[in-house]
Amino acid sequence: PKKAEAKFSIKKKDDAAAKVGEDAQNAAAIKAHPLLARLQLGGGLSTVGYASVRDTAAINKIIYSEVAKRVLPSDLRLLWSAKPADNLKVKNIYELHALKVTTTTGRAPLEGDVITDAKDEFDQMGSPVVSMKMNTEGARKWAQMTKANVGKAIAIVLDGVVYSAPRVNGEI
């Protein structure tokens, strides 16, 4: 019995030491690479990376810093998804989107004033979608935007967060 207890306590000490070592490695990685230690790169289209909700504030400090403003392109906007990514096994992971500003004013090319009607519906696969109707000017501009961006994403942004950024498959 004493040997079993000794083995158990040694293993427990080893587990604790491993945890301390892992924590030290994580702290060193965060110190050496504060952004890359918190943001998992990848995603495709407009998504440049993923991060835990608990890391978004630290990432924001970096990506919205004065240094970042000097080195990142002036037409780049980095914005978080409105909701956690639903296609991941881990919960509370948000997508960071890279959006290109395409107007001289920095405003969206289309805004809410062109929407004449919007309602919740379900698509043919049973997934929830928002159906929108636009006025003539909005519909014309939307057709131009989708035609010019086939194969790329167009982000739907409200109050500074990305609600959707689907791939454009053709002019709409």
Where are these regions (language model features)?
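A short acidic/small-residue loop/turn micro-motif
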Residues: 170-172
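Non-transmembrane, solvent-exposed regions of membrane trafficking/translocation machinery
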Residues: 1-168
